[in-house]
Amino acid sequence: ACERVGDGLVAARYLAEAGAHVACYLLKPRDPTVDENFRLVQERGLAILLASEDGKWHRLQHTVREADVVVDALLGTGTRLPVRGALAKMLDQVRRGLAARRQPSREPLTPLGAPPLPAKRDWPFVVAVDGPSGLEYDSGALDRAAVPADLTVTFAYPKLGHFRFPGAGALGELLVADIGTDPALAADVALEVTTPDMVRAWLPPRPLDAHKGTFGKALIVAGSVNYTGAAYLAGAAATRAGAGLVTLALPATIHAAVAARLTEATYLLLHHELGVVAADAAHMLAEHVEEYDALLLGPGLGRERETEAFVELLLRGAGGRRRMGFVGTEESATPLPVLPPLVVDADGLNILASMKNWPKRLPPGSVLTPHPGEMARLMGHPVSEVQADRVAVTQSQATTWGQVVVLKGAYTIVAAPDGRTAIEPFANPGLATAGTGDVLAGAIVALRAQGLGAFEAAAAGAYLHGLAGDMTRAEMGAAGMTAGDVLARLPQAWLHIIGLSTGSQTGSQYHRLPSG
């Protein structure tokens, strides 16, 4: 394994120079004649403790009890599990010491029955170099001996294991430090973590003499009597993500409920059967769909037979060719249109999964936005297989289906058929609530309508959505977040991204809110 002891010794020296009292606890002795960093630490007179001279770990236990900061600089990239022998025992002692320091307060409860808020942190802050010792950097596997960190500092580029669980859950906040690596070294890498600089470059300009057509027209087919909120959230997100005009095509029976909340949209009222879109509504869309720059299909549609028939009719003969069929009866036949760039979400995906040869029915350049359950249905495989290797599965299916795929979840994956892949740097339990997927789909279709390519719209939309989610969580915590809270912060997320100067370090660094 590639060890990080040298990095730890350098950190010890700089901390000492800054005035900290530093002790270095080493698993094995170092030779100062060949280890320059160890020699410099010795010359500074820093305390050096050896595991080989600490048979019952008493000195290690005492050091952890007294420490304000613990720096884990043992194992790095190249680690293979399991961790064994003295190293496993050493990490176990550190973990036990930290756990003892984290014991809850023994003070009496307040009159309301709640424990008092702590005045200050009373246990060490753990910093991991590259990652906790015991993290496998390719798979994200985490040894049981690993010590979870509060902050992980890695260099040049993040590693795949930083975004795969369970290891990703043990990093705390992740910081990618710029060490002057030549960008040309990564020029041919197709897998990237989305950064603010990337999103800023993709977002369209907003000229002073613009009109609403400048920023695109988005058509959203969504909603049913049981899911009025999905239509509202998707439509409102599209307006908040910059689309010039948003039209909601929805069952006429829910129009009043949605329009009362979303006054900025226009509406196309569709025929319905008991509150769900009816099959013959396809001919109504056929008369209007070519007026729009992007189409979102699916949020809250439901899966009734009428709606399934509607989706089948709408997609009949798609694939980018002018279609020679008709929608409706002979008396009211309307030529099938060429669909604008398409985003499919939620029940649209579930209906696709029930159709034979569904990938051939989609126009090129479509974006599919499944959560793991929907992805499993589209693939015909169990969810466990989807989650086992999210990056590889998303890349494979994007190529197989010939469309951009957005696999939602902690560290959302965006993959294009040509192999380009983005990992979105957000893992937020507050987004695990109803409606947040509708907000994401609305953001993506808005960016597609503004002229972004399918991959760029998907990656940028997921970044805006994730950043808005993190802003919401920072303000109100994860437990009480709603999709509407995230929706309200989309403009702030956009402003935050475009407000960052291109010379800032934010483009090469990544900060994540700590877990919990």
Question: Which residues are covered by each model-predicted region?
Answer:
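Charged C-terminal helix
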Residues: 467-516
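Phosphate-handling active-site elements
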Residues: 15-32, 448-461, 470-475
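Short, well-structured alpha-helical segments that form the helix of a local strand-helix-strand
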Residues: 390-398, 454-469, 483-491, 507
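Short pre-catalytic strand/loop immediately N-terminal to key active-site residues, enriched for Gly-Thr
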Residues: 207, 422-435
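Glycine-rich phosphate/dinucleotide-binding loop and adjoining beta-alpha-beta core of small-molecule
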Residues: 3-187, 249-426, 498-499, 510-516
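Short, small-residue alpha-helix embedded
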Residues: 376-377, 433-464
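Radical SAM [4Fe-4S] cluster-binding motif and immediate context
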Residues: 207-271, 278
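Long, highly charged low-complexity segments
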Residues: 181-214, 276
